[in-house]
Amino acid sequence: MPSQFFGLNIGASALSAFQTSVNTAANNVANVQTKGYTRQTANLSATDPIRVYTRYGSVGTGVEVTSVTQERNLYYDEKYWQSNSSRGFFEQKLYYVDQVQTIFRDDEQSQKGFSSIFSQMFKDLDTLKTQGEVKAVRNQFIHQAQSLCTYFNALSKSLTEIQEDTNEEIKASVDNINSIAEKISVLNKQINNIEVRGGHANELRDQRANLIDELSGIADVETKEFEVTNSNGCLLYTSPSPRDMRRS
């Protein structure tokens, strides 16, 4: 037969469990503006019952918090990473397309630009066909041909500068990717050290998700998380250092 304090113990377990739930809710409110924070939930479970009455069977002993887990959906994470990768790709593409368009764009005031120079070149060529004996016409055509050569030289220089800037940006992006990958590798080890013992590394998982968010804005991202076990069913863990990317 349970002691006289049995009911008090049940009440105490309820107070302790719901205090944890309240603390978890307070933590959610406190981090409502924290970038990358994932809402957490205290999971409750009935404690092991005891058998005290032969006729009625077991009786409950209270409640306990079994874990505090994240309310996060991997499906939406993957969709976001895919969309963020596409957005980053097209933003960079648009940036360089705008630069190239600026180089080829005509200046209406100075009448300089790809279309203007070529149009004037062919006009002078047509005039030269009909008035080739006129020295001024010949000089005008020569001058326009020189302007075309000067324009092409300037165009080549500008495109080369864009290419060099692109190469430097690629190098910086590769370095950034390697840096993020190294941080993710460190977090993976820390998460494993906690969760292999049955814990939940919620805050560390948030940090890792933030890094993947950042990484997805630079390159395509695909993540896989799985447990490795040996033939006896024991959990194994291997976390090799990330492979550095190199610009080819």
Model segments located where?
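Intrinsically disordered, charged and Pro/Gly-enriched terminal/linker segments
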Residues: 177-178, 213-216
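Bacterial Type III/flagellar export signals at protein N-termini
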Residues: 1-141, 146, 153-154, 159, ...
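Periplasmic/extracytosolic POTRA-like scaffold domains at the N-termini of outer-membrane
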Residues: 189-209
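Long, non-coiled-coil amphipathic alpha-helical linker/lever segments
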Residues: 145-195
